[in-house]
UniProtKB/Swiss-Prot annotation:
Its cofactor is FAD. It comes from the Bacteria. Keywords: FAD, Flavoprotein, NADP, Oxidoreductase. This is Ferredoxin--NADP reductase.
Amino acid sequence: MNKTIYDITIVGGGPVGLFAAFYAGLRGVSVKIIESLSELGGQPAILYPEKKIYDIPGYPVITGRELIDKHIEQLERFKDSIEICLKEEVLSFEKVDDVFTIQTDKDQHLSRAIVFACGNGAFAPRLLGLENEENYADNNLFYNVTKLEQFAGKHVVICGGGDSAVDWANELDKIAASVAIVHRRDAFRAHEHSVDILKASGVRILTPYVPIGLNGDSQRVSSLVVQKVKGDEVIELPLDNLIVSFGFSTSNKNLRYWNLDYKRSSINVSSLFETTQEGVYAIGDAANYPGKVELIATGYGEAPVAINQAINYIYPDRDNRVVHSTSLIK
């Protein structure tokens, strides 16, 4: 357990959680971010990094990756007072003597207040379901692609048939030594235009095939074994990198154990984003209230309200008047 007690712990490192962390830093309190994925950014970074977003205030258009990069750049100002914990899923929390002990699947964390900004729940990639898969994850087996350049000159195999799988195959065909795509059906689910580009490219297309085995050492996969659907043909595909693009699932399965009032996968909150537990708040898609509009922009407005309420709760005797950033940053 890290025995440092942080003022505010933000559960979720998507755009709303990142802005909440920045605003908390602006208010001069210590902050910890707990994110279930291996990187910050939430849905924009994982599900649509290259897609264009048109409803972010101040940006006529911005991609998901660009948006998250801006948030991370914004956080740099307070890097000394913000700790980031990746690849940790919150399981439970308990309050004793005005301090919360937050239990994750890896550690325990101490905090005076909690702000849930975890969207519809922790992200988890859909797996191949093959033996030793966990040994290769984040080494040379990937479930999403954030930097295409890392595959330059490599032999890459992609599993999947949706937009992401096909788009990655088309882009990697330009820079990789070779690309193969494996899909369990004859027809791809991706956009027709993207599929047409794929079929005209140098990408090796294997349909309908399913993965049945992984070969490699204790850390890196060296080949993928696939089998023809409704057939006996088996092919071994040597590779440098394997990309599994079966999508992601979200789950707030632990929500039911947190003694919070909730509806489906979101937490019911007051107009001040308070939950039914004192010192616990929820914002973004994690929060539910009448008239809720699930937009990133909405979450940006909710974050300062929740952070200010948390500060008032932690430091009731302090002068907590809100000051504009122009007065705080010189």
